Amino acid sequence: DILAAFRVTPQPGVPPEEAGAAVXAESSTGTWTTVWTDGLTSLDRYKGRCYHIEPVPGEADQYICYVAYPLDLFEEGSVTNMFTSIVGNVFGFKALRALRLEDLRIPXAYVKTFQGPPHGIQVERDKLNKYGRPLLGCTIKPKLGLSAKNYGRACYECLRGGLDFTKDDENVNSQPFMRWRDRFLFCAEAIYKSQAETGEIKGHYLNATAGTCEEMMKRAVFARELGVPIIMHDYLTGGFTANTSLAHYCRDNGLLLHIHRAMHAVIDRQKNHGIHFRVLAKALRMSGGDHIHSGTVVGKLEGEREITLGFVDLLRDDFIEKDRSRGIYFTXDWVSLPGVIPVASGGIHVWHMPALTEIFGDDSVLQFGGGTLGHPWGNXPGAVANRVALEACVQARNEGRDLAAEGNTIIREASKWSPELAAACEVWKEIKFEFKPVDTLDV
């Protein structure tokens, strides 16, 4: 069975047992009345069952309802169908004030019907020939308004300065000021020029997201013809069907696939209603993607530390133990489905580097947009500052130093011999984003 943990907030007067049973019925075989065609099938075999209910500590009138869905209710290899069943009509149910899907347990038999990520973490490392450290990226800013040539120039400067990747922003598709084909050409030029000068393999996440699946595939084909290593897709706005098609194309044609989660906070940010991001992360691993944005813990975007680490492990590891202290409701086994690299991006700069290195470890991409391009000396020195800071943190960690306690000291020591890093440290020494997260663990 597929197991689901729902956070249910019933309307006043509705007992939790009734609410839980209603969720299970509406998202499987039930409807609002008894119908004579019920007698033509075996409802006992196909109905969803609410098998356990527990109150949420510290929250009045909220319950975690566990529901089991027979596997035959779902089409094989279709994230789209899985979500249509589990989170379809039921979220508009009048008997509930709010409903949130907190976690899913996907049985090994169903996981095996998915291709998963096009390549996975180890194959990506081998393609890039980069080991033993997080990868560095940069989102090109301003996200909208640059011409293709200026955009390509910014990519080149960042890659030349020491970054591994640059990135199209999620809303860069094919607008009047910069058509997709022009952008692809200038970015490919930036990649090849910087590769020749640095001797390292470089990439730019070319956003293939488009208004139709056919147009999206056309862009992916053109990227492959240019010989670039990686493309990008907005998987929630583009849709799971389009994303799975693109992931299959990427595996068949040797392209890595970077996934942006634009629109996720509409779905996952409220604590009592929606779908938790750990479920969207599992869905992405099944649908297919080699990278996905996962929050930073320390930057400008929402993300509580233990919760973030919980779904980062769901993305990377092969086997995950149940751990309610990190928001993981079920033990799960990915049966050798390739892992996804989490991408930390959003309001981060060199002073965050020790924390990011400690939190995310080697199998991650640390992406500094403003934290690269906002350097007072320009894009290339911004890239140099980030690379120096990263190398210093990785070396310190490998020497056994405590990054959490000594992080600032490590950065200051490195800035003594790197003027680019010293300038970056000076610019961002006061920048903080200190707001309480909306989505926290239940205590």
From Swiss-Prot:
It catalyses: 2 (2R)-3-phosphoglycerate + 2 H(+) = D-ribulose 1,5-bisphosphate + CO2 + H2O; D-ribulose 1,5-bisphosphate + O2 = 2-phosphoglycolate + (2R)-3-phosphoglycerate + 2 H(+). GO terms for biological process: photorespiration; reductive pentose-phosphate cycle. The modification N6-carboxylysine is found at residue 167. Binds 1 Mg(2+) ion per subunit. Substrate binds at residues 89, 139, 143, 261, 293, 345. HAMAP family: RuBisCO_L_type1. Belongs to the RuBisCO large chain family. Type I subfamily. PANTHER family: RIBULOSE BISPHOSPHATE CARBOXYLASE (PTHR42704), RIBULOSE BISPHOSPHATE CARBOXYLASE LARGE CHAIN (PTHR42704:SF15). This is Ribulose bisphosphate carboxylase large chain. It comes from Antirrhinum majus.
